[in-house]
């Protein structure tokens, strides 16, 4: 334990030395470690602030406040801001810039110090921007526990980190920064629990996780990632997201699906059907595409790389987005990813040229409301393309009904599905029954899987192999009997 503690103390000194070295020039360029900082700051700062929950009249704790890029903006609306940084010259610079705000308290303190005294249940929002990457794994874990205590019930933690690799172009003699995988942060925050003196149990619920769009646009870089968490009762129902990530879309399940569908894909036909369907969209360079239920991002990378479009990929599954972000490393394409519930998102009118969704909307119970949102979000002349599981008209058999229930699906026949799009205001609606193609693709995937049985079992397990094979055979039975169908839908906004 003593050796471990000594190592942590030494690492803390390394980080302090690193930031003293990079705080000689107290400028935005020095703080962001980037020669383009001034231009980036103009678009990135408003974007980051837009991700926060409402903070008017709230108490905000800003950890790693630096020279105050965000302090003044927070002070404009918050009732109180505590701006904290562990480099004295930096926090003094912040005070010289923002000291005229009487609702800001400036503190020179280290977030890892046990002597840092913040009262329990006293803060509405904890905000940090590039902080945790300068802490050890153990320090991150301890800080998350303390932050949960400092927050009022219902309060929020927002943080943003550089993941995978550095983004700034400043030359550095050494770089002790921890460029972690996003799933490291997600796991630690998700697993943090506490009990207060009254016996109430609390945990953190993920509200959102996304790339910083300014970095995707300017640097084709998805490694700037933000999270928003809320302090909730441990008994609160976490709903559909937890169901997805703990059952159908566990990490291992996603990897199994990808093995069947091909690298980057977790939906029917993988790259082959993606090429066919995307070719129907007449995509033009610079157009903006929303992919609803983007999975692990293969279709988004394909569109961005081959058609030079900008893609926003959203998925409710934290695990899916974690994989998508990892797959984006080094691709240098204009794709943003976000953990989001499409039924709760609200984009401005006329935001997208295309909305694309593959075998996802089967999870959505109120499709008419979602299609009305799609219509609103599309630009005039914009297109929607959806492939989805459907059912034959009439009452399903007991077995198929049980399958639908177990998966939590909401299925319609192809004609009814097309009518829902028409009723939402779309024109030129094409509703095609593609079940024959679905059967061919299923059989092809099953044949390929059976041919590489030994390799699959080596990489996963025999149980995993049997699970996938049985699932594909069951789908083939349901589709050949005509109960389960597959629809392709294309429609246009006038």
Swiss-Prot record:
UniProt-listed Gene3D superfamilies: Vaccinia Virus protein VP39
Regulation of its activity: Inhibited by phosphocholine but not by choline, glycine betaine, monomethylethanolamine or dimethylethanolamine.
One GO biological process term: phosphatidylcholine biosynthetic process
Cellular component annotations (GO), alphabetically ordered: cytoplasm
Subcellular location: Cytoplasm
pH note: Optimum pH is 7.8-8.5.
Catalytic activity annotation: phosphoethanolamine + S-adenosyl-L-methionine = N-methylethanolamine phosphate + S-adenosyl-L-homocysteine + H(+); N,N-dimethylethanolamine phosphate + S-adenosyl-L-methionine = phosphocholine + S-adenosyl-L-homocysteine + H(+); N-methylethanolamine phosphate + S-adenosyl-L-methionine = N,N-dimethylethanolamine phosphate + S-adenosyl-L-homocysteine + H(+)
UniProt: phosphocholine binding residues: 162, 167-168, 172, 179, 257, 389, 403, 407, 409, 475
Matches recorded under InterPro entries: Methyltranfer_dom, Methyltransf_25, Phosphoethanolamine_N-MeTrfase, SAM-dependent_MTases_sf
Molecular-function annotations in GO: N-methyltransferase activity; phosphoethanolamine N-methyltransferase activity
Residues binding N-methylethanolamine phosphate: 248-249, 257, 389, 403, 407-409, 475
Lipid metabolism among keywords: yes
Pfam families the UniProt entry points to: Methyltransf_25, Methyltransf_31
Associated pathway: Phospholipid metabolism; phosphatidylcholine biosynthesis; phosphocholine from phosphoethanolamine: step 1/1
Annotated positions binding S-adenosyl-L-homocysteine: 64, 69, 85, 110-111, 129, 266-267, 293, 315, 341-342, 358
E.C. designation(s): 2.1.1.103
Induction: Indauced by salt stress.
Keyword Repeat: yes
Enzyme class: transferase
Superkingdom, natural source: Eukaryota
Record's keyword terms, sorted: Cytoplasm, Lipid biosynthesis, Lipid metabolism, Methyltransferase, Phospholipid biosynthesis, Phospholipid metabolism, Repeat, S-adenosyl-L-methionine, Stress response, Transferase
Function: Catalyzes N-methylation of phosphoethanolamine, phosphomonomethylethanolamine and phosphodimethylethanolamine, the three methylation steps required to convert phosphoethanolamine to phosphocholine. Mediates a key step in the biosynthesis of choline, a precursor of the osmoprotectant glycine betaine. Has no ethanolamine- or phosphatidylethanolamine-N-methyltransferase activity.
Quaternary structure annotation from Swiss-Prot or TrEMBL: Monomer.
Similarity field: Belongs to the class I-like SAM-binding methyltransferase superfamily. PEAMT family.
Name of the protein in its database record: Phosphoethanolamine N-methyltransferase
Gene: PEAMT
């Amino acid at each position: 334990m003593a050796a471990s503690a000594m190592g942590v103390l030494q690492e803390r000194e390394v980080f302090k030395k690193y930031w003293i070295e990079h705080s000689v020039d107290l400028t935005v360029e020095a703080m962001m470690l980037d020669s383009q900082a001034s231009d980036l700051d103009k678009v990135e700062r408003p974007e980051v602030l837009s991700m926060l929950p409402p903070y008017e009249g709230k108490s905000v704790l800003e950890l790693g406040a630096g020279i105050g890029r965000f302090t003044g903006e927070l002070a404009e609306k918050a009732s109180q801001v505590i701006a904290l940084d562990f480099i004295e010259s930096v926090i003094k610079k912040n005070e010289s810039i923002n000291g005229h705000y009487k609702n800001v308290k400036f503190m020179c303190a280290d977030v890892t110090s046990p002597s840092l005294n913040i009262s329990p249940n006293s803060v509405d929002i904890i905000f940090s921007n590039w902080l945790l990457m300068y802490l050890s794994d153990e320090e991150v874990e301890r800080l998350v526990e303390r932050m949960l205590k400092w927050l009022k019930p219902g309060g929020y933690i927002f943080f943003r980190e550089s993941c995978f690799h550095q983004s700034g172009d400043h030359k550095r003699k050494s770089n002790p920064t921890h460029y972690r995988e996003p799933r490291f942060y997600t796991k630690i925050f998700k697993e943090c629990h506490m009990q207060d003196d009254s016996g109430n149990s609390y945990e953190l619920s993920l509200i959102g996780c996304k790339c910083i769009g300014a970095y995707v646009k300017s640097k084709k870089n998805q490694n700037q990632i933000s999270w928003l968490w809320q302090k909730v009762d441990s008994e609160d129902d976490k709903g559909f997201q937890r169901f997805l990530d703990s059952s159908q879309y566990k990490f291992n399940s996603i990897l199994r699906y990808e093995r069947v569908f091909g690298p980057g894909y977790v939906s029917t036909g993988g790259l082959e059907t993606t090429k066919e369907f995307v070719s129907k969209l007449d995509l033009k360079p610079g157009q903006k595409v929303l992919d609803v239920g983007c999975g692990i991002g293969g279709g988004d990378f394909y569109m961005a790389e081959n058609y030079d479009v900008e893609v926003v990929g959203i998925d409710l599954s934290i695990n899916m987005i974690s994989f998508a972000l990892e797959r984006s490393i080094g691709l240098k394409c204009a794709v943003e990813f976000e953990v989001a519930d499409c039924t709760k998102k609200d984009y401005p009118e006329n935001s997208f040229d295309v909305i694309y969704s593959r075998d996802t909307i089967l999870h959505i119970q109120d499709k008419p409301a979602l299609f009305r949102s799609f219509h609103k979000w599309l630009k005039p002349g914009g297109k929607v393309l959806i492939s989805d599981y459907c059912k034959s008209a009439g009452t399903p058999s007991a077995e198929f009904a049980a399958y639908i229930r177990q998966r939590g699906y909401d299925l319609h026949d192809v004609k009814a599905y097309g009518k829902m799009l028409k009723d939402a205001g779309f024109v030129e609606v094409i509703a095609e029954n593609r079940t024959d193609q679905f059967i061919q693709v299923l059989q092809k995937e099953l044949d390929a899987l059976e041919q590489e049985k030994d390799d699959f079992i080596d990489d996963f397990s025999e149980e995993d192999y049997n699970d996938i094979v049985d699932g594909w055979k069951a789908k083939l039975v349901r589709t050949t009997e005509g109960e389960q169908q597959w629809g392709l839908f294309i429609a246009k906004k006038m």
